[in-house]
Amino acid sequence: MKVVIVGGVAGGASAAARIRRLDEHAQIIMIERSGYVSYANCGLPYYVGGVIKEQAELTLQTSESFWDRFRIDVRVRQEVTAINPAEKTVTVHALDSGKVYTETYDKLLLAPGAKPTVPALSGVSSERVFTLRTVEDTLRIRRFVEEKKPKTAVLAGGGFIGLEMAENLAEMGVSATIVQRPKQLLAPLDADMASFVHAEIRRHGVTLRLGETVTGFRQDGDSVLTLLEGSEPLHSDMVLLAIGVTPDTHLAKEAGLRLGIRGSIAVNERMETSVPGIYAVGDAVEVTHFVTGQKALISLAGPANKQGRIAADNICGGNSRFHGSQGSSVLKLFGLTAASTGINEKAAQAAGIAYDKVVLFPASHAAYYPGAQSMAMKVLYEKESLRLLGVQIVGGEGVDKRIDVLATVIRAKMTALSLTELDLSYAPPYSSAKDPVNMAGFMIEDLESGKVRQFHWNDVEDLPCNGSATLLDVRTEWEYQRGHLDGFRNIPLDDLREHLDELDRGKPVYVNCQTGLRSYLACRLLTQYGFTCSHLSGGYSFYQVVTKEQQTARSAYPCGMEKL
């Protein structure tokens, strides 16, 4: 059997190695357009920033190491320019020599990945405007930074690459500005959870220009102007386009393969395309979202590697299946970790799923052990079935551990109530006896059993302030004096029993505390004394971060932009 693989990196390289493990006698040819067949593309921003010191550390395998270990014929700096499914051939252009030749195949695997989205704007070809996707891109940016020593940079786009580059540039002393049309960074997060990310970025000196549209670029001596719709241009020494990626599927389209959403390659669970004998994996293919069942584009290394393995199994006569991706991701940003899995509120609404949510602020480990850090945790679940839909966590240490546990719960199709039963490891330096994952389950259990009601940060402005309801803040007097919600009366939780006669049982009670715990306790107390009570999910802390970010964003917009 002769297998030709178009593209390396995650999907193609993992498939090549798997095919060899399954079939020692197969002829395997891997053709890669760049000069690097297998590299850590997720580490590229950290090489630019000097966190990863040596270029060699980015290289996972080379052409030589693939041959020595797997006897795989790797051809770098060669580009497949056409596929002929009827003849089972590909046309290859050797970029260095200019030679064009034809290669036959029995099985063909496409792993072309995705290319940076470069809008058709004036000035994008400037030598000071960069994209970051390959090792060559990284070397070009690193060389520019070392030689030109830029003081300012504009990043067009606020996805993973844009944020990681903003962090690395800021750590190098470069004044960075992120500009994008959406008013929120990190699309997998809901806007309220993204507020924590925005605040952290601003705290480290990165300027956010959200809700603004880039209309072009113009070279201005040793700087470049980023032109904005309705605003003054931004002057900087360099620009990085981090708008996103687009599936690189022109070969598949020209070969007559069926395409999916946004021009991606349509595949089945076996990673087979619409043409027999041709498989496809990685960022170029559409997948089924594990939670919604809808088609999606999820450009992540984990799914690409799994798809490569599955395609290899089936190329070698197996029957492996890819059952979809839930988009689990994690990001380091200065002192913060942001992670998500499954779907957010916007996606749940788009899919027509009736859901509820809880917000909590647990500590990373036992609070009495030094170094505990808080995290903001948002858990979505389906109302009818109680299945877990998605989780977002932003905080310090321990975020990655919890998101992986909850990603496993989603994959296992367990209910939100099952979180209460998870038997998780505990020692004071690592967790609490009631782990944050368990705590989320306890909160959902109380909600669903009717033991507590809740309202959310965006409900606060609609609360009745005409005396028809009791608005109660159960924090300490000191906390209350430092800041509180308008119209809320302060009765500390520990004093509440002594003040029950001052409250009208005929009025609904809305309770607030710092993070939601004491308000929950107050509601349980009040309910048992005949009051109808709801508490603020996430408490004053959550409300304050979200509303403060909204105010900061509004003040940053040019006049009228806040309405766009």
Q: Where are the model-predicted features located?
A:
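Beta1-alpha1 glycine-rich phosphate/pyrophosphate-binding loop at the start
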Residues: M1-R77, A166-L189, S328, K401, ...
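Mid-to-C-terminal Rossmann-like scaffold of FAD/NAD(P)H-dependent oxidoreductases
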Residues: M1, A284-E397, P428-S432, P436-D462, ...
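Glycine-rich dinucleotide-binding loop and its adjacent helix/turn
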Residues: L110-M172, T207, V267-E269, R489-L493, ...
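Rhodanese-like catalytic fold shared by cysteine-dependent sulfurtransferases
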Residues: L417-P428, S432-A469, E477-Y510, Q514-L564
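A Rossmann-like FAD-binding core segment of flavoenzymes
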Residues: H25-Q27, R69, R75-D96, E103, ...
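Rossmann-like dinucleotide-binding cores of NAD(P)H-dependent redox enzymes
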Residues: T59, T152-A153, F160-R218, I298-A304, ...
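Short hydrophobic core segments
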Residues: V6, E103-G113, A156, L234-G244, ...
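FAD-site-proximal beta/loop scaffold in flavoenzymes
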Residues: S125-K149, G221, P233-I310, V405, ...
